[in-house]
């Protein structure tokens, strides 16, 4: 073991012992269980909290002399220790506002922001830790087969109650690109998130990182071996580990930070004293508040195109504070500290390494990528039928019809009313006969107000003990849409079986195809319960993060209520995830096909089971624009099936807004139009013919691109790729892409530049270096059964970019979509449903580089069966273009996909007019070449599942 003295910032008394670690571990594979854990199993199979920290270039500090008294409140900071750069000050009063006397009694420094020479800074703490503030000391460091262990000791308590004075540190060098360390209480078992994480038994052979420890104050320093950049340095502020307050700070190597969802903000988070609160909450999206999901993972971009990520697996209420130094502080109200650091080195790899831990996204059924339509206010089957008929008559594709609460009897789950929905089952059968699917809302809260025997879900749930209980052991009763309600405990194995039974029984009446699970933060219309909440430390913790409403019980249930695995205090942020797991499981066992679940509440690992929509957004240009970074954020978090309510949910949309939102929504991975009961209807056919034509053009483009989109989801499912991705994921070495969040990519090949402001007929977007072809050059409508739209207005066919911002024409009927040179994408004739579009002929769009090369692939299966990869029931074909020749490679071919007909190949970037075109050696005479666009269109008659070769000269 190599021990050395660190380079400290001051020449003062104390040791900064650094131990350099260069060991590593074999990659394990994560499996997130269905939470069917017995209490005795939990200790061995849970991994606890994953914590994230961003690295920083500064060296770890060395403590100055400090005269330690018996109690923390008697400490006094040495005046010279308070000379800390304002942006590097770490808050010593996170729990409450305090006076100078109270601050100094904590042993901290007091410097009002107004007294700083550079002027006041909003958010800058007045009371902050001196570098000498006592922390833990590292002792008994020893090697293990997979890393290191050590003991951490603290000699004086902090100002939070129930400090844990002795801690255990375990460091695991799990893979070459993944470091894992945990800080626990060795004498008392604490709650750990029930996520089964990779188990690694040996050290990685060639890690990309080195690990060092500061002995006193204790800290972990993680460096990137290549260049020595510090990625994580926890010595910048003292470690806290009390029963209900855990705090860990780290420096960051840059101010370019993304992640930490869910929030309404730009893609890159501000480090100007920004607090992000993670405590799932039913609240309409707005800036600066905790929203529906909690994802304690961040990705940091570094100079030179490198990136790393950090994940803190902790489901307790927490704040994450970003400050300008730059630095980050985690403050959690419970659990343990369990930190994963992902070394990348490029951003794309960071996301994949994170998903190696939390799980790769599920593969959605093909129909789930079509258009979904819903509205709160479809109050009868007659209205729903009319909506579907109107969509068909006006030639708008519709794959999935939804219902909100309207279908229910007294707004109770697993019922339908006999007034407007007496023939509900018949309506769903009719949708199926038309090649469509059906989904409806299901809230978790179960009505408890009826007499015994009147409502089977509650009666059966009560008998089987599936509900969350209060301090007396009785079901906690809150209030949601049906009135008095109980809340299922989805961490209880019995609840999973009960939920499956309820889903199966209702499906036997109404054969729905997917589930929309809403209100699952869980939402509660009263605070806590009808009886209130007990006055205890879980309801009134010593530290309350910045939650909307100021209390953990606000708009949800009591924190001290009891669930199978732990208290709701610990499990709250997992409620939506556990319901998604239960719903996915129930659909698999009920329908026997691929599940399709869309959930409002999410947590880390959610994408493995379900998709997400962004909640009750407003019909406003602001929320239209914010939807882009939110879609990108969730793709980075491993939830690629995500979308916002097209045209907005709350408030009345306008025609222009709805057209522009539909154009952008055509490139949401999950495409749904949905709005509120009190807002004007906004189905596409409600607007003028001009608006309808513009929207229909966007629909046509999406449906033509579905084979490419489906192939992207396959990549997400098997490799951890993103579907919609920020530009920096493909171009990390171009700093101009880092903050772009008004554009998005579909995979590596398509760049979408939407109009996000009113009254605009042009749009400005960033084009990374290279050639970009306008997708309007590729004819798609002739392949399908939809009517042709009006001819496209003049457009710039090819963009030759040096890496620059460009202004493009964008009339109301146009969304700019560009195909990146070097890629081949599959297309298919668009139709009114995916049932029909999957039968249409296919095409290839080939975008050549200046050297005349391109590549791509197509994944295809039956679109809904389970286990297609395991059974080999799929087709995977790759395409490549080089030297004026296009060939395919049959990676794996079955009947599903092998018989797809290829009818058109459009080649972009053909600089010289060809005189001869061959398809499998046979001359093609009816090709067309455009000298203006440099495009070559070749009609062919080929099968995707057979080898082919296309030549031109």
Curated annotation (Swiss-Prot):
Cystine pairings recorded for this chain: 82-109, 92-108, 103-127, 533-558, 647-658
Pfam families xrefs: Gal_mutarotas_2, Glyco_hydro_31_2nd, Glyco_hydro_31_3rd, Trefoil
Reactions accelerated catalytically: Hydrolysis of terminal, non-reducing (1->4)-linked alpha-D-glucose residues with release of alpha-D-glucose
Residue span(s) of the pro-peptide: 28-69
SUPFAM superfamilies named among the record's database cross-references: (Trans)glycosidases, Galactose mutarotase-like, Glycosyl hydrolase domain
Glycan-modified residues: 140, 233, 390, 470, 652, 883, 926
Main subcellular location of this protein, as a coarse class: other
Family: Belongs to the glycosyl hydrolase 31 family.
Biological function: Essential for the degradation of glycogen in lysosomes. Has highest activity on alpha-1,4-linked glycosidic linkages, but can also hydrolyze alpha-1,6-linked glucans.
Protein name in UniProt: Lysosomal alpha-glucosidase
Record organism: Rattus norvegicus (Rat)
Name of the gene this protein is made from: Gaa
